[in-house]
Amino acid sequence: MKKKVLIGLSGGVDSSVAALILLQQGYDVEAVFMRNWDSATNMDFRGNPTLYDETCEQEKDYQDALKVANKLGIKLHRVDFIHEYWDRVFSYFIDEYEKNRTPNPDVLCNNEIKFKAFIDYSEKFKPDYIAMGHYAQIDHTGDEPKLIRAVDSNKDQTYFLSQLKTEQLRNVLFPIGNLPKSEVRRIAKEHDLATADKKDSTGICFIGERHFNEFLLNYLPAKEGDMRRLDGTFIKRHFGLMNYTIGQRKGLGIGGTTDTTDAWFVVGKDLSTNTLYVEPGFEHPYLYSDEALITEVKWRGAKRDGKFTAKFRYRQEDQDVEIKWIDDETFKVFYPQKIRAVTPGQVCAIYEDEVCVGSGFISVVYNEGEKRLYS
């Protein structure tokens, strides 16, 4: 008897080709389209460029998923996780901005929706596996599954999957993890899939492209405050700390207001005084740190102090680090080479060679023992 796989079919080219490959490998495949956002229900009006479109983006994606399912001859189910997404992902996203941190919704989206709500939903189908069109690989040969980087390093998504627990990966397949993106496109065209030339999705996970600062105003009021240099010199007013992140250059509007020709960057934020700190120069020393406290850690395998590599943001080059555990869900990470713009709220993903062993959230950032005013 064929083993059964339930795949998340998003209406994009990656999950389309993943479904095709599963069929070619001899699995009994059914697909599920997840709808996780409703602009009317969620008051998504400001900053929404698709607000007046005749057909919403998620409906267009569903129609593309349906075309692919029909082409492949597989059944497509449709499920709404709108409330789950709001409660488990988006509320946290907004809370983090309110706390003056910069969250990564894609990490929570995977942890809470694609590999939790979806897995719970899949139980009624009794599949042997679930599958997604992620660029990642899983080694199922040992006692516990290992999350391994994708062949296409530019598309590797293990950073976004780094918070998953071992049990969430146990019955998961990533059919395109061993393929470069160019090959995925080629396969889609060769098999005349409707999504072959469709652009990759961008923007906020399951929400899409938004004019971000305006979008946040749907949920958080902007609180103006002072923009100052680290020595206290007043520069101008800012439009709300939530609109800025550490290392940001764009949107400061300082040009012509000072006597320096260097570009200005956000180097600090102080929620207690609602002050945004800026300094000229991409390499300003205050943008660099050598240590961070990592909390809410999810780890796969035995915990040990020692040397690893890390990514402090998506697509960052691997950084040599040393970690020291404080308790079961907290460690400190040290990087004496100093790294620019390590930002509270973002994820620090830890790797041992090609294996992603876990991650946690950047809580506090230090340089030479001094806490940075990053949050």
Swiss-Prot record:
Gene3D superfamilies: Adenine nucleotide alpha hydrolases-like domains (2.30.30.280), HUPs (3.40.50.620), Translation factors (2.40.30.10). The record marks 134, 346 as: Interaction with tRNA. It catalyses: S-sulfanyl-L-cysteinyl-[protein] + uridine(34) in tRNA + AH2 + ATP = 2-thiouridine(34) in tRNA + L-cysteinyl-[protein] + A + AMP + diphosphate + H(+). ATP binds at residues 8-15, 34, 133. GO terms for biological process: tRNA wobble position uridine thiolation. GO terms for molecular function: ATP binding; tRNA binding; tRNA-uridine 2-sulfurtransferase activity. CDD domains: MnmA_TRMU-like. This is tRNA-specific 2-thiouridylase MnmA. It comes from Acholeplasma laidlawii (strain PG-8A).
